[in-house]
Amino acid sequence: MKGLPPSLRSRKRYIAFRIIAEKKIDERSLSRALSEKMLSLFGECFAASGLRLEAFDGERGIVRCYREALDKVMVALTLMTHVGGVRVIPLTLGVSGTIKRCKRKYLEV
């Protein structure tokens, strides 16, 4: 069975972000907190967002989602206040269509 042609596939977007936290947080707890925030804000329809934490180094990271859900994911990311019991302030750095461009433009120092 053949896959979908590129013109029919869902487009992905990559959101670069920075987390200011009182203590170090790990990738798993951040991913869980973001999923829980999406679920509480938008209900079960967040499953169609294609949400995935691509990279996180303790302070900066990249979240992948489908283009149609970009606004919802950015809202959920912005409204997060706690991750695993640690108070956080998430800052969105920018959005890109590829991981490579996202890293080069927003995450390199």
Swiss-Prot record:
SUPFAM superfamilies: Rnp2-like. InterPro entries: Pop5/Rpp14/Rnp2-like (IPR002759), Rnp2-like_sf (IPR038085), Rnp2_archaea (IPR016434). It is found in: Cytoplasm. GO terms for cellular component: cytoplasm; ribonuclease P complex. Its EC number is 3.1.26.5. Transmembrane segments: none annotated. It comes from the Archaea. It is an enzyme of class 3 (hydrolase). Pfam families: RNase_P_Rpp14. It catalyses: Endonucleolytic cleavage of RNA, removing 5'-extranucleotides from tRNA precursor. One of its GO terms (biological process) is tRNA 5'-leader removal. Keywords: Cytoplasm, Endonuclease, Hydrolase, Nuclease, tRNA processing. One of its GO terms (molecular function) is ribonuclease P activity. Belongs to the eukaryotic/archaeal RNase P protein component 2 family. Consists of a catalytic RNA component and at least 4-5 protein subunits. Part of ribonuclease P, a protein complex that generates mature tRNA molecules by cleaving their 5'-ends. This is Ribonuclease P protein component 2. It comes from Archaeoglobus fulgidus (strain ATCC 49558 / DSM 4304 / JCM 9628 / NBRC 100126 / VC-16). The lineage of its organism: Archaea, Methanobacteriati, Methanobacteriota, Archaeoglobi, Archaeoglobales.
